Amino acid sequence: MTRRYWNINLEEMLEAGVHFGHGTRKWNPRMAPYISAKRKGIHITNLTRTARSLSEACDLVFDAASRGKHFLIVGTKDKAADSVASAAIRARCHYVNKKWLGGMLTNWFTTETRLHKFRDLRAEQKTGRLNRLPKRDAAMLKRKLSHLQAYLGGIKYMTGLPDIVIIIDQQEEYTAIRECATLGIPTICLIDTNCDPDLADIPIPANDDAIASIRLILNKLVSAICEGRSSYIRNH
């Protein structure tokens, strides 16, 4: 894998609060190598380690995108949801930002069945067929469509398992991480000072609670994906 330059700036990360961890009482001792200091009862993340991990992750996603691989971005908590959707749409990635439905990957057959139902209902709505049904039936199907849009809208074009999964909050998305581990799907995880770096293939030590921090990390990753996709298009 070729190392590239991704313009990862320590000052920019400081401004975004990437270095702020959790209170020292909440820390995970396995995060010790990624922590540089304690300040006012809070652990401070070593941004040099963050930059190194982020650069490695950008190299990985660029390389994967340049070979036509598919990505899934997962972040369901309120502070991450909007950033996840906009980053994924920009880089044409699949995303989950509402709720991780257990078995979404490990029980792919069921997920695929739901996606087929979702696509059928969307098609019926677009053609106006739903409006020609009895009011009660139409209302029930519209509620069903709204529910599917909320939970599966970000993966509606997914036709198989992703090649790489990017996860914003390790503790919040523990089920997703376990499913990826079961299936052998590589994960890139933002890990705050209360997380376990050993659960991710590429852990990126960073503040996973601040919107600015989440957005900065995602922007770097999707920029690398977009560059990789451009390379893939040029060569095919």
Curated annotation (Swiss-Prot):
Database matches in InterPro entries: Ribosomal_uS2, Ribosomal_uS2_bac/mit/plastid, Ribosomal_uS2_CS, Ribosomal_uS2_flav_dom_sf
Family the UniProt entry places it in: Belongs to the universal ribosomal protein uS2 family.
Keyword Ion transport part of the UniProt annotation: no
GO function terms (MF aspect): structural constituent of ribosome
Organism encoding this protein: Illicium oligandrum
Name under which the protein is recorded: Small ribosomal subunit protein uS2c
Main localization, broad class: plastid
Biological process, per Gene Ontology: translation
Keyword line: Chloroplast, Plastid, Ribonucleoprotein, Ribosomal protein
Subcellular location(s) per record: Plastid, Chloroplast
PROSITE patterns: RIBOSOMAL_S2_1, RIBOSOMAL_S2_2
GO CC list: chloroplast; mitochondrial small ribosomal subunit
